[in-house]
């Protein structure tokens, strides 16, 4: 077994030959991600030091750990004649999972960071394994990992923060589309497919794309982003809890049974039905926020008074008007930082 200090990811640059790249990619049951199944002798893949059993982390600088087999193959073929693959062997993968480190291209050049190093990324969902309990992701070689949001501190570099933000028509919210290798975003632990929850301590789940961009740019040289990976996002939505900074290191929420609403423990907030209902109960066009019922947030669901019912009916009629499309929304499909 190799010493931990000698373990590192490998960046393999392949130039396509007459018979292709010369390797076979496949998924493994019970493990997240795509793996190198076979490398042909004398092929470009063998020359690039790709090995059977390697797990694929990035393709051409884009993290693919959460993508399907078809999506990964498409990314490999997207650049004609060549491709760049960031991979980890089994020992390195296990070490990264044990230390809860996010695999980055920077590690291929510098090696794994020592403990408590300032540039060490935050824990991520990269560890492969089978799903564990409601509160964790179980790795085949280790204990369950707690599903927590991640707080990423970014300090702007000469080329910006180094990530791309976009919205998805099929689901609400803002998502990290891609992260530039070696960028401030990459070093902070920000990953592709993360969903953005807070910017500089303020929840942005109900904001439009242009408004979120403005909040990120509000502080000139740094930003603090609270994000969740797809698995953590699904877990918190299942509990109907809004992730906050308290969940990064503090107590995690637990489901409450016997018909009681699912509440966040230890000072957090209950996830409002705003994220679960159609647009009639979202923010009005003039920017006024949907008013939360303090009793409902504490787990109580009271019948509305006659005045409240009348006000709700009036608001419903007003909200039936089709909102005007913000020209910024038309112009700015996604933004680079």
Curated annotation (Swiss-Prot):
Membrane topology label: Peripheral membrane protein
Primary site of residence: membrane
Compartments in which it is found: Endomembrane system; Nucleus; Apical cell membrane
GO BP annotation list: inner ear development; negative regulation of phosphatidylinositol 3-kinase/protein kinase B signal transduction; phosphatidylinositol 3-kinase/protein kinase B signal transduction; positive regulation of monoatomic ion transmembrane transport; protein localization to plasma membrane; sensory perception of sound
One GO cellular component, as annotated: stereocilium
Taxonomic superkingdom: Eukaryota
Gene3D superfamilies: 2.30.42.10
Keywords assigned by UniProt, alphabetized: Cell membrane, Membrane, Nucleus, Phosphoprotein, Repeat
Keyword Repeat: yes
Distribution of this protein across tissues and organs: Glomerular epithelium cell (podocyte) (at protein level). Detected in liver, bile duct, kidney glomerulus and lung.
Protein name: Na(+)/H(+) exchange regulatory cofactor NHE-RF2
């Amino acid at each position: 077994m190799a010493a931990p200090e000698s373990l590192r990811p490998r960046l393999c640059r392949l130039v396509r030959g007459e018979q292709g790249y010369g390797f076979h990619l496949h998924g493994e049951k019970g493990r997240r991600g795509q793996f190198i199944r076979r490398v042909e002798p004398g092929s470009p893949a063998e020359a690039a030091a790709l090995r059977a059993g390697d797990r694929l982390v990035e393709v051409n600088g884009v993290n693919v750990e959460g993508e399907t087999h078809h999506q990964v193959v498409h990314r490999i073929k997207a650049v004609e004649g060549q491709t760049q693959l960031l991979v980890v062997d089994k020992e390195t993968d296990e070490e990264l999972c044990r230390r809860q480190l996010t695999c980055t291209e920077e590690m291929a050049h510098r090696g794994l960071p020592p403990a408590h190093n300032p540039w060490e990324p935050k824990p991520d969902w990269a560890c492969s394994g089978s799903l564990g309990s409601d509160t964790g992701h179980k790795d085949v070689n280790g204990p369950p990992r707690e599903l927590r949001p991640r707080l990423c501190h970014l300090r702007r570099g000469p080329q910006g923060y180094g990530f791309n933000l976009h919205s998805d028509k099929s689901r609400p919210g803002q998502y990290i589309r891609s992260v530039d290798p070696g960028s401030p975003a990459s070093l902070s632990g920000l990953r592709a497919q993360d969903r953005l929850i807070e910017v500089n301590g303020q929840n942005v789940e109900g904001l439009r794309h242009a408004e979120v961009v403005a909040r990120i740019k509000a502080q000139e040289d740094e930003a603090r982003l609270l994000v969740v990976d797809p698995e953590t996002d699904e877990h918190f939505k299942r509990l109907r809890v809004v992730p906050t900074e308290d969940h990064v290191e503090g107590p995690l929420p637990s489901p409450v049974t016997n018909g009681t609403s699912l509440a966040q423990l230890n000072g957090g907030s209950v996830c409002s039905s705003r994220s679960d209902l159609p647009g009639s109960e979202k923010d009005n066009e003039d920017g006024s926020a949907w008013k939360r019922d303090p009793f409902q947030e504490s787990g109580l669901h009271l019948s509305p008074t006659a005045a409240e019912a009348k006000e709700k009916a009036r608001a419903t009629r007003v909200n039936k008007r089709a909102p005007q499309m913000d020209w910024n929304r038309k112009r700015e499909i996604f933004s680079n930082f």
